[in-house]
Amino acid sequence: MTKIMFFGTRDYEKEMALNWGKKNNVEVTTSKELLSSATVDQLKDYDGVTTMQFGKLEDDVYPKLESYGIKQIAQRTAGFDMYDLDLAKKHNIVISNVPSYSPETIAEYSVSIALQLVRRFPDIERRVQAHDFTWQAEIMSKPVKNMTVAIIGTGRIGAATAKIYAGFGATITAYDAYPNKDLDFLTYKDSVKEAIKDADIISLHVPANKESYHLFDKAMFDHVKKGAILVNAARGAVINTPDLIAAVNDGTLLGAAIDTYENEAAYFTNDWTNKDIDDKTLLELIEHERILVTPHIAFFSDEAVQNLVEGGLNAALSVINTSTCETRLN
């Protein structure tokens, strides 16, 4: 019987993975550990592997997999910047991802957390906790229908986000290297700077690559409309975090919401209760009154989890049986 290791298992995924195995006549072994130099030897008797990595995979894992006859790694996220695709190819390892698992879930997160900042919820909550129930100009908002929203990246998630904002009646500008002609309710601009210059809300939905690395830094924030709101449910490396904090502090941004952080791997998805966080930048984000931080959880719905579990396992089995899969990356 074909054997697949399901690394990075969370409690709510285990039953889904085992049920998939029964339906597909595959022996699925679940493990809470991640694929790494320390765990790769567990795969000696396996045919395939799926995992959910957040940090960079060590280089020595690829030749080890090749020596064990394993032909693939099925990543259970859309992001894949934790893999060296060229090195994997050199060792005959097919890397795959799950490019679409519930774009609407992430879009709903992006809009809902932006609305918290639009309606000044963090400020209102602090005032209420201090028993200040007065109405002040500082907590007055304006309707989204009177706002301009910039969508940076109009793939599946960006497009779904744009459609929600269109339902509010917002004016929508966008930038994407490959414009989507079906999104006739928005206006594409020739550059990111042009797209954001009049935006009240900026919503980021771009992959992590050389072009997007620190795309939003001080130079980009200099082109932002004063008092704008920034939401990042894309990849942490898209933002230069110290520059983001500075932009909020000096009033360039009214506030920001980030679901991803460039150096999140050591912390996000882990329970850090009663432990010291050594990352001073992360602490500054968490403690900032006008920055909302969530732990890479924008995708987290029952539909998305089911699709990620099955997407990873389906890709692994496809490569085992046919040497390729629809979602291969290299």
UniProtKB/Swiss-Prot annotation:
Catalytic activity, reaction form: (R)-lactate + NAD(+) = pyruvate + NADH + H(+)
Binding site for NAD(+): 156-157, 176, 206-207, 233-235, 259
Domain of life of the native organism: Bacteria
Record bears the keyword Magnesium: no
EC number: 1.1.1.28
Record has NAD as a keyword: yes
Active site location: 235, 264, 296
Bilayer-spanning residue ranges: none
GO terms of molecular function: D-lactate dehydrogenase activity; NAD binding
Stretch forming the signal peptide: none
Keyword list, A-Z: NAD, Oxidoreductase
Entry similarity comment: Belongs to the D-isomer specific 2-hydroxyacid dehydrogenase family.
The name this protein goes by in its record: D-lactate dehydrogenase
Native source organism of the sequence: Staphylococcus aureus (strain MSSA476)
Gene name of this polypeptide: ldhD
